Amino acid sequence: MPRVISIVSGKGGVGKTTLVGNLGAILSKKFDKKVLLIDANITTPHLGQYMGVDFCQTTLNDVLRGKALVDEALYEHESGARLIPASIELHDLKGIDISKLKKVVAEANKKIKDTEIVLIDSAPGLGREAVASLKASKEVLFITTPYAPIVIDVMKCARIAEHLKLKPLGVVVNMSHGKGHELNKQEIEALVGLPVISTIRHHKEVHHSLSARKPLVLHRPRTQGAKEFYRLAEALMGVEQTNPGVLARLREIFNRFYSTTPKNTKKMQAQ
């Protein structure tokens, strides 16, 4: 059975979609994992746009309404990751029953038999969309910025995940500037009750990748921000990080000599 991981935040704008896109690209392209990304933020979806897959004919909305099969809403990204986007059209919110998300995820795992990891880009907060993502998952990774109001919201999300008996993977602190007015690692861990497994600093290159509609690890793989996403992916996969300097040099060599020309994004059917 594949790992099903929801990426959860208590507030929008903390980098949840950016995290999902970059992790998906790394796990697929570098770890050779069969990865499925699902945009479960139905009301304000961004994952498809971030990955360069938008204005799709068939989306998760159609599947939730029972008007399409799950494999009909499946698209392949240039990284090799598969993606089920949500519709950006306002009228496509009609007739959506988000409580069916768990059933859709189960159906996707049944039809796409080689999937190893499912990453769900959940809606922020504690509403029905966010809870539906949690209920469809087995594991949960929390993301926050280093400020008390947002960390407190994550604390609430963590309590719901605990109630649902989900496996917590820890907390990612995003957009850190390393300033004294920010909460530090120990303070965040004390509030949430979970370990901080990664701190990703604020990098302007992330904004460039947003404009390019491409994950940072593909758009600018040698940047410090990309390296931080790599280290997080390694932690999630249980890779030892005893000598990150060597890993960084190996990646640089790989990127220099073995980088490939991106494929066009294409729609695919389940195999």
Residue ranges and their predicted role:
Residues H163-Q271:
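C-terminal lobe/tail of nucleotide-utilizing enzymes
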Residues A25, P45, N61-D62, E72, ...:
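Solvent-exposed alpha-helical segments within well-ordered globular domains of core cellular machineries
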Residues V20, D97, L101, I150, ...:
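Short, conserved glycine- and acidic-residue-centered signature motifs
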Residues L37-K111, L210-A212:
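P-loop/Walker-type NTP enzyme "switch/lid" segment
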Residues R3-A40:
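Walker A/P-loop phosphate-binding motif and the immediately C-terminal alpha-helix
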Residues M1-R3, F31-K33, E78-S79, K113-T115, ...:
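Short coil/turn connectors at secondary-structure junctions
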Residues G12, D39, V63, I84, ...:
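Residue-level signature of catalytic and energy-coupling elements of molecular machines
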Residues L36, K103, E107-K111, I117-H208, ...:
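Conserved catalytic-core segment of NTP-binding enzymes
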